[in-house]
Amino acid sequence: MASPNPYSYSPQLPQREESPYQEDQYQSSPSFRSTPFRSSRGTGAGTGIGLGLSSGFTSSLRGGAGGPSEPRSGDGSHDDLPQRSSSSSTVIPSLPPKPKPSSIPETLWSLQIPLHITHQSHPKTPYICSVPRFSYLALLLPRLTAYYGTPCSSFHHEEVHLRNFAVGLLVDLYQPSELPWRLTVADGMEWDICDTFMNSAKEADFIRNGNAKRIMGLSKEHTTALWNAVQDNDYQAFTKINTHLLNAPTALKNVPIRIYIPSSPSPPSSDQQQPQRPGGSSSSGSYRVMQTLVPPRGPNNRTPQTLGQALKSLLPALFPSSRDPVLASVILHGAPVPFSAPLEELMRDASYPDGWLCLIVVLL
């Protein structure tokens, strides 16, 4: 059977309803399943969603907070027993407990972010859904266009035009004060999200190996499967291909890392100061991006380089200590990252699907 073409992917579009609160009807789609959600804003995180603030990044992620609510099991209550209907003696069996993710990457792929989307011409007709943290807003555009009956191609947060970043990265950057995250959709600049993702993945592959032979050597079938796995939020399918990309026959040269630094709301002094700012006149979410080559091992090439060592080397004014956050900390997937974390381990366990570690600087 021929592989699906990622450029021709077009999910079934919903019919517009007049209800003021339209729940996402795509229960069968693993990419945009409408699920319960809970907010867990942690002190100091300021990310709008939380993975739980604990003593370490690993335990924060394994906590799973910020994702869909899961049935309780074995907690001493009777929630796992069959329930009887109040109107009859019929026994209604309860659903089996949902298995918990067994690894950090699997936990990250399971996290969902609730959205409340309105159109400029329909401010009182929201489209409410919950999307995976690793998904992209652009994948919602066909549904929103059909729902509002008008072309939709861009998203805005407080008048700031959002870039085509993963949803989780956008949440960490703009730190919404409450959930669901309220966005506005309109007609405007648009990107081919498949091209955007693949170009970013190729750049990450080049940084890791000094060339992009690993990803360029993928067959058309595997390249299509990689993008389809992101669209479908299919961790298992993604891992089969990503494992090949991460395990090159040569040693890892550099870790693909981008550091997002909050900048002053005043106008930049040069055109190069904010090359990747989303746009708009609002100072909300104003930032600059640092991207440079960061080796996975220290200067002596004997010990793994830690996050703290890299931050002190790249931004000594913000990170004078390589052991503890003094003036600033960094957020990754809604959780603070310990400075002792080895960069290569972070790359393998906590990179976005395109291969990049995206760290958000938070001033203390």
Curated annotation (Swiss-Prot):
UniProt feature, compositional bias: Low complexity: 28-42, 269-286
Post-translational modification summary for this protein: Conjugated to atg12; which is essential for autophagy.
Polar residues compositional bias, start-end: 1-13
A single cellular component GO annotation: Atg12-Atg5-Atg16 complex
Glycosyltransferase is among the record's keywords: no
Top-level taxonomic group: Eukaryota
Keywords noted in UniProt: Autophagy, Isopeptide bond, Membrane, Protein transport, Transport, Ubl conjugation
Localization per Swiss-Prot or TrEMBL: Preautophagosomal structure membrane
Predominant location: membrane
Positions of crosslink type Glycyl lysine isopeptide (Lys-Gly) (interchain with G-Cter in ATG12): K202
Membrane topology listed for this record: Peripheral membrane protein
Protein name: Autophagy-related protein 5
Organism of origin: Neurospora crassa (strain ATCC 24698 / 74-OR23-1A / CBS 708.71 / DSM 1257 / FGSC 987)
